[in-house]
Swiss-Prot record:
Keywords: Ribonucleoprotein, Ribosomal protein, RNA-binding, rRNA-binding. One of the primary rRNA binding proteins, it binds directly to 16S rRNA central domain where it helps coordinate assembly of the platform of the 30S subunit. InterPro entries: Ribosomal_uS8, Ribosomal_uS8_CS, Ribosomal_uS8_sf. This is Small ribosomal subunit protein uS8. SUPFAM superfamilies: Ribosomal protein S8. The keyword Transcription regulation does not apply. Belongs to the universal ribosomal protein uS8 family. It comes from Verminephrobacter eiseniae (strain EF01-2). GO terms for cellular component: ribonucleoprotein complex; ribosome. The gene is rpsH.
Length: 131
């Protein structure tokens, strides 16, 4: 059965794994998921990730990050979804927690944070908020 929202599945798997203090989480891989994982790594929300291929299926293994026994990601939520896409222009890209968190945005120039999208001067689809 096909998945209707693979990005929401990625975020939910990360959230659930952190609630039970798992060191890693495995999700089916795609280019967008790898780009989201790269943004999370660059922003310091995860320790790292790698793409593993077994029996022709590619999976993304994400190493979760904890500080003093608590997950670094306090909140991760989907914004744009298949039933209601959320697009913002370069001037309307939202800040998360007054700049303490990040909004992950997919733009014509790739997947990036809200700060980088504003600095680059591009808008796009707001995928999720991370804090």
């Amino acid at each position: 059965m096909s998945m209707s929202d693979p990005i929401a599945d990625l975020l939910t798997r990360i959230r659930n794994a952190q609630m039970v203090a798992k060191p890693t989480v495995m999700v089916p891989s795609s280019k967008v998921k790898v780009a989201i994982a790269q943004v999370l790594k660059d922003e310091g929300y995860i320790d790292g990730f790698q793409v593993k291929t077994e029996a022709g299926k590619s999976e993304l293994e994400i190493a979760l990050k904890y500080y003093a026994g608590r997950p670094v990601i306090e909140r991760i939520e989907r914004v744009s979804r298949p039933g209601l896409r959320v697009y913002k222009g370069r001037d309307a890209i939202p800040q998360v927690m007054n700049g303490l968190g990040v909004a992950i945005v997919t733009t014509p120039k790739g997947v990036m944070t809200d700060r980088k999208a504003r600095a680059t001067g591009v808008g796009g689809e707001v995928l999720c908020y991370v804090a």
